Amino acid sequence: MKKSNTRAKNKSKDLKDTVSNQFKDSLLKFIESSEGFVYPLIIPPVQSIDEDALFEVYSDLRKIGEQDNLNVLLYSYGGDAQTAFHIGRLLQAYSNKKLQIYPLREAKSAATLIASAADNIVMSELSELGPMDPQIKLPSIERRFSPLAIKHSLELLHGEISNGHDLIVKTLAERLPDPLSLGEALKSLETGKDYLRKLLVSRMFAGDSEKAAIVAERLVLGYPDHGYCIDFKEAQDIGLVVQEVPDNQRDALYDLMYGYKKMWDVFEFAMSRKDDNESSVSEAIRPLIDLKQVVHEVIDIQKSKKNVSEEK
């Protein structure tokens, strides 16, 4: 029985090593097809854009140093708007001439705020942005919630009042947060618009504050749902500066997306089978550790190549 368990663990380790190496190979392939420095800013679904992410990004950027052209591979489901704005500012500060952001499959909500820091956003057929609607936590509510959902609830409430549906109005009103919390929720939408406008006017719409304000308004209030899919065409329609992935990068970017998906599949499978003992948990989270290690390795590889090139 012990031998069987050992074989299973070795097989699992071999699979994780293979998937991790494939992801690294895909990253290096993408780097070869790119002009400028490539920075994988990947925040897995079990994490969010928060204070820890900010410190990690800052540490990475200090290692990378200022670059003329910075290409950011961005993946995240979102998180804190204030932190996302700060990360966007850092990316702008470390890219002297051009900042391109590639949504690596999904860059939703607060990650879309980060993407708005770019000079242009490069999207494939699978790339997806989302409305700027970060989930917030208020003392009066146990779970995180969408400020946009609160806004839509208030609009529905207003409509039902106009139609004289008193019972529906009473039921809806009882489920809403207290007035102070409502005010905080709605204020967060205005804060999101302001963050978007400031990042957009810094680079993408440099000097055109009116265009930046229009696009920010659409990203915050223009969609009915927090998870709405903003693909390439939709991003174009609302006025973002987007371009399709160049032909020479198309295969590499797809391999990268699929490679990351496989890493995440391995993690989810390991989590579903883990026990509560320390070694089992450690084994389950290894794909996340491998991911960070791969990111640091490709940063070091690019830095070494640049140093050799400058010495010549």
Task: Kindly label every feature range from the protein language model.
Residues 1-106, 112-312:
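Terminal-region recognition feature
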